[in-house]
């Protein structure tokens, strides 16, 4: 629910940004963009924070949208959120332990000689599987 609300707010902010008057500036008024950059730099300075907020023009204010960090992680992996949740659920199922009886063989199709010579990784060393 929270992700969908954040996505809607983010999309709305992008949609409104496309239709602001600042996007339709004629080429003759490009010098004003440098003036707006200076205004933005002055807003970020600490000296402006001490002044009265009424002194800042209302037309130069911008909305900054911060997304949830979990959403960005999912975007970097390239998988949609619903597929990641399904994969995580599948991973939990894959990590379940299977118990075997002691008298069960590994496989009836493997001969006893071959089974005894098979090697299993124990730590950093390969040892015969029957020693494990």
Swiss-Prot record:
Gene Ontology cellular-component terms listed: synapse
Stored InterPro entries: Prepro-melanin_conc_hormone
Listed PANTHER family: MELANIN-CONCENTRATING HORMONE (PTHR12091), PRO-MCH (PTHR12091:SF0)
Residues in the signal sequence: 1-24
Role summary: Plays a role in skin pigmentation by antagonizing the action of melanotropin alpha. Induces melanin concentration within the melanophores. May participate in the control of the hypothalamo-pituitary adrenal gland axis by inhibiting the release of ACTH.
Keyword Signal attributed: yes
Name of this chain's protein: Pro-MCH 1
One Pfam family cited in the UniProt record for this chain: Pro-MCH
Keywords, ordered alphabetically: Cleavage on pair of basic residues, Disulfide bond, Hormone, Neuropeptide, Signal
Tissue occurrence: Pituitary gland. Produced in neurons of lateral basal hypothalamus which project both to the brain and to the neural lobe of the pituitary gland from where MCH is released.
Superkingdom: Eukaryota
Annotated GO MF terms: melanin-concentrating hormone activity; type 1 melanin-concentrating hormone receptor binding
Family: Belongs to the MCH family.
Cystine pairings recorded for this chain: 120-129
Gene: mch1
GO biological process: chemical synaptic transmission; neuropeptide signaling pathway
């Amino acid at each position: 629910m929270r992700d969908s609300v954040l996505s809607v707010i983010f999309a709305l902010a992008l949609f409104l940004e496309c239709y602001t008057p600042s996007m339709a500036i004629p080429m003759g008024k490009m010098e004003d963009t440098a003036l707006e950059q200076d205004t933005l730099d002055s807003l970020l300075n600490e000296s402006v924070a001490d002044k009265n907020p009424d002194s800042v023009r209302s037309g130069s204010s911008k909305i900054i949208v911060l997304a949830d960090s979990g959403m960005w992680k999912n975007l970097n992996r390239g998988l949609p959120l619903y597929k990641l949740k399904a994969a995580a659920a599948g991973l939990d199922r894959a990590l379940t332990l299977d118990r075997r009886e002691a008298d069960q063989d590994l496989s009836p199709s493997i001969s006893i000689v071959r089974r005894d010579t098979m090697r299993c990784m124990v730590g950093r060393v390969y040892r015969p599987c029957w020693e494990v």
